[in-house]
């Protein structure tokens, strides 16, 4: 992963404040970071893939005139509460959290996108989730796990995922692939492929907000 990180380090990652570009604002949230590595397998660490995929998404969106704010642009620890507080404070048009999945038996595979429960019958986040998923599948032969909502076991009226549940803004969470699945990661095994994944996520966002 170090080669992927070094090849992507040249990306412009300075967070931009809202309003500078004159376009819509997107908040990109690379999952985990710092002392929270996320999933890992064979030396691959989720937090690194999340960040580098997010850098590519940011680069693409900025090239298209979007104003992009990253919750983190380095390998630092950031709580879920801080991520959503930043979103609720800066009020982007869309919050997108980027992750790589994992499974206990290493049998999980494919790509999926979670969106807000309130949009289950149609709405912004369902549209965004659909567009991101379609764009990823356009370039990667991953299993289509679909777009999904997930509810709290204790309250079926609330989103399970904190960054969706506690976020006042439209928000989705992308699980790009299973980090512990050899077939999945064989499709994303170079800096170019990581960049392509991030670009496809960016295209899905662009499709939704243009």
What spans do the regions from the language model cover?
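Non-catalytic propeptide/linker segments at domain boundaries
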Residues: 1-25
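Active-site-proximal helix/loop segments of hydrolytic enzymes
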Residues: 15-18, 49-210
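Extracellular repeat turn/loop positions enriched in glycine and acidic/polar residues, especially those
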Residues: 31
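A short acidic, helix-capping loop that chelates divalent metal ions and anchors anionic groups
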Residues: 36-38, 182-183
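Glycine- and acidic-residue-enriched helix-capping/strand-helix junction motifs
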Residues: 37-52
């Amino acid at each position: 992963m170090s080669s992927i990180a070094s090849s992507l380090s040249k990306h412009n990652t300075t967070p931009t404040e809202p309003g500078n570009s004159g376009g819509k604002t997107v908040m990109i949230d690379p999952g985990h970071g710092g002392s929270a590595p996320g999933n890992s397998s064979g030396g691959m660490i989720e937090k690194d893939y999340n960040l580098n995929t997010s850098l590519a998404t940011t680069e693409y969106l900025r090239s298209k005139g979007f104003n992009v704010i990253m919750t983190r642009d380095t390998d630092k620890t950031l709580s879920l509460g801080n991520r959503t507080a930043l979103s609720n404070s800066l009020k982007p048009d869309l919050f997108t959290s980027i992750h790589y999945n994992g499974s206990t038996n290493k049998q999980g595979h494919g790509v999926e996108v979670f969106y807000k429960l309130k949009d289950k019958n149609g709405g912004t986040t369902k549209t965004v989730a659909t567009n991101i998923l379609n764009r990823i599948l356009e370039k990667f032969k991953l299993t289509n796990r679909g777009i999904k909502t997930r509810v709290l076991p204790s309250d079926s009226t609330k989103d399970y995922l904190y960054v969706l549940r506690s976020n006042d803004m439209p928000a989705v969470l992308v699980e790009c692939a299973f980090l512990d699945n050899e077939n999945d990661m064989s499709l994303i095994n170079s800096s170019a492929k990581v960049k392509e994944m991030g670009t496809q996520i960016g295209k899905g966002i662009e499709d939704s907000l243009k």
